[in-house]
């Protein structure tokens, strides 16, 4: 079996480590016994990935729950029975200096791969709680806003305590937050999800499986 990646120039590779990183970036998604030739657009996508990875690392290491590079948008959900919008879903975006707005399909896989997703989720939870507080102060009646979490985050031993502290710090009721979880893929994940669902229920938090 083989994978062949051809480059028309490698001027920006300063050492062997950078070359391996470049090669793996293009080779990993390839099928076996195949080859590809890289052009200028491919090099740009590699550099964009490097920049995005560096920004995600900085966001995670900085640790601020108020990081301005992470944005939350609340998308209203219509209640067809009541005929109004009474819930919403929190959507995450990044706004970076060199690239502008970045959508989840570009940064979520990188964040999960490199272990940064938990910090992003806690930032979104914090900003969602703040948005709920602002909605309430302005007289909007929202039953709850859902926030997405990945299965991998649930195994963090501090997950529930961090979740609880963020919600309480923002002064919102637990029932105004809903947690949307990725569907479990094996028995181990199923047990973990079930345990967390029961913990959320004890707090008054509604949970959904995506």
Label each residue range with its predicted role.
Residues 2-16, 39, 82-87, 116-192:
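Catalytic core of bacterial c-di-GMP phosphodiesterases, primarily the EAL and HD-GYP domains
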Residues 10-71, 111-115, 153-160, 193-194:
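C-di-GMP signaling machinery
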Residues 24, 105-109, 118, 198:
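Conserved long alpha-helical elements within nucleotide-processing catalytic cores of c-di-GMP signaling
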Residues 42-110, 148, 209:
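Active-site core of bacterial EAL-family cyclic-dinucleotide phosphodiesterase domains
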Residues 64, 136, 201:
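Conserved ATPase "switch" residues in P-loop NTPase domains
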Residues 71, 144, 176, 206-207:
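Hydrophobic "anchor" residues on beta-strands that sit immediately upstream
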Residues 197-210:
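Short beta-strand/loop segments at the ligand-binding rim of alpha/beta enzyme cores
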